[in-house]
């Protein structure tokens, strides 16, 4: 496609690529040409995804009504119920809401706020889900309750703060890089069917890439984090010249056993990107298929 540019600002027309492009990665290449001489060239990649809904998926349970996730279920014809004592052991339960919200502050600390609209019976609910899994059920944690590593000790040193709700007792840890990179790398697994594997979670994964990782437990890690503390122990008195703190590894997506069942623990931003980013939808569908 050739477009003639005039002096000043030229409004470019939209390029209609149609609706029948095959699934895959594409490159749009743009060149600025004057008198048959290329002055400048750039390019941008984009992906086309397709989701197969020809096979009926099994039903799921959630712990709270949420328009974003229920709209997703409706679009993909997935039956759902609110988790209760009568939920079948064959029905995976999705933990789509927890009793706190976690934010990253500019200084590398973690801010946690208790949701005012959450039930006071949250611990009882988590205990019921733990018992459900122990008997052979499966739980998909898209939100992780439990302790968070914060800089709240003497001289802002790190301490694990909060309540352990899960039997594995994972600890949430800030894992967002600034000038220093923090890698989140996925591995080959059915959950990443039809998606790139063994790569850093940038590019097509940039919307769902985590900023919180899990430590202090053992599981089958599908997305792994390699990071380090910018300040040794978080101690504000050690932030000069000494260098960085410990190097650590955490999990962003992991499957752990509990009794006769399994728990999937995820810090990926899947719920936030449903009905917006197809990668989040493909991953959640793959997760549901994995546990059916």
Feature names for model-found ranges:
Residues 62-66, 70-90:
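A short, well-structured beta->alpha microelement
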Residues 89-91, 135-138, 261-262:
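Loop/turn elements at helix/coil->beta-strand transitions in domains of secreted/extracellular proteins
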Residues 1-13, 21-31, 38-58, 158-160, ...:
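Extracellular ligand-binding/catalytic regions of CAZymes and related secreted enzymes
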Residues 93-96:
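Receiver (REC) domain switch-region micro-motif
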Residues 65, 69, 124-128, 280-284:
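Stable alpha-helical elements in mature extracytoplasmic
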Residues 100-211, 266, 276-279:
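A glycine-rich, often tryptophan-bearing local segment used as a flexible ligand/cofactor-contacting loop or short
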Residues 60, 80, 139, 263:
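Hydrophobic anchor at the start of a short beta-strand
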Residues 68-72, 104, 272-276:
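Short, solvent-exposed loop/turn elements at domain surfaces
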